[in-house]
């Protein structure tokens, strides 16, 4: 039995190990990979490897793996990557896994600056990436620094703004919070809908020369071929939709494109190496085939996939709605519980206050009772003294009378009687004054006792009211394959039919233009970042983008502009560049 060969395939989010036979073809390995990851939209993808000359190459599906220019190492290393891009992600990408693989690959391209992305769009895209990873923002879970381990912005953007990590996190967090209620899968799709409007999205660039020898860029994408000046890969100058091309071929470094318009000359350019022309041919064939397929009714398989995807999405939405409903119920229950706890605490506090007031009133009552007793004792003492003085006065009166009688009876001498009379009169006067003073004091004490008695009655009434307040009970708790071409030339007929006249892509608008929410977010971010921007660190692409914005250009307006005029006019324009 022949010895097996170890193979390692790296997808955007996983690493797969396989053992293949020496006679295993590229298609057999590819089929094994897509089956393992559960991918059905296989037409976008391919297996990439570094050949013996360190060039990045796509594995040919119709040849044995071992017969290709793969480095002889163990295990053999391949990357599973998107080779072709859709025109419109929301219309064409059906499965969640397809959307996720595109999302991860596009995000990597943006973060590595392979796809130019302006700062404000980069921050908005970062917030969707965060929503797809973490779900809804939760301040209890997503504490300060929760994005510290994530690479979310291109290094260029970080260097162009005077903001530290915390300040960047704050800005991304604000937009993360804006996406509350959005499913992770929907966040992925929203990311791609904005990213596909970036000028460099989905474009394969090749360095070419025209007949004059001018160095230019050829851009191959889902919509056709575009020509760029050497110093500007954002703004194509001439465009040829796939519907205008009937044949593509190369002979060594010369590449020839024959237009459908028989009156138009051939579109000829030169690549620096034969292998580049082979790759251009393969990409043209694959993109053209997908372009034509999109303009025909969906196959039964695609219809079934779309129906299944709709059903799965509906199921997820139902589950999400159920979860949201349960979450709301739980939150309401928590709030009700908190409210009851709060009311309970308030009532307990009130009860405590009443108890303290009652205790204080009791103490005051006791104090007033004590004072009342003291005043009563004082009153009795004053009364007793007044009675004693009255008695003494009476006795003095009696003595006086007796003396008077004795003077009459005994005829004492006038001087003696006068002296005794004077003494007694003085004594009576003193006793009378003392009596009046004591009576005055008794009246004063009587008034004080009366006031204390009134305070006592009032306190008793307050205590009675406090004690009669009902006891508060504690509330109860609620709860294509690259054509295998060994030779230096190859040709491919690009079939066309009535559907080829469908150039609906020229009517498209950007997500920002048709989505008011995205437009508002981008304007707010542009304004917010302007104050922190270091103008001295602007790149050439930044300046080109700014100029395009000033002139009101976007990807689709430029597309319409560069396709104006007939094919001959555009080929002549290419030759004169």
UniProtKB/Swiss-Prot annotation:
The modification Phosphothreonine is found at residue 558. SMART domains: B41, FERM_C. Coiled coil: none annotated. Residues 358-401, 492-518 have a biased composition (Basic and acidic residues). The modification Phosphotyrosine is found at residue 116. GO terms for cellular component: apical part of cell; apical plasma membrane; basolateral plasma membrane; cell surface; cytoskeleton; cytosol; filopodium; focal adhesion. Gene3D superfamilies: 1.20.5.450, 1.20.80.10, 6.10.360.10, Phosphatidylinositol 3-kinase Catalytic Subunit, Chain A, domain 1 (3.10.20.90), Pleckstrin-homology domain (PH domain)/Phosphotyrosine-binding domain (PTB) (2.30.29.30). The modification Phosphoserine is found at residues 74, 407, 527. The modification S-nitrosocysteine is found at residue 117. Its main location: membrane. Transmembrane segments: none annotated. Ezrin-radixin-moesin (ERM) family protein that connects the actin cytoskeleton to the plasma membrane and thereby regulates the structure and function of specific domains of the cell cortex. Tethers actin filaments by oscillating between a resting and an activated state providing transient interactions between moesin and the actin cytoskeleton. Once phosphorylated on its C-terminal threonine, moesin is activated leading to interaction with F-actin and cytoskeletal rearrangement. PANTHER family: MERLIN/MOESIN/EZRIN/RADIXIN. The [IL]-x-C-x-x-[DE] motif is a proposed target motif for cysteine S-nitrosylation mediated by the iNOS-S100A8/A9 transnitrosylase complex. This is Moesin. It comes from Mus musculus. The gene is Msn.
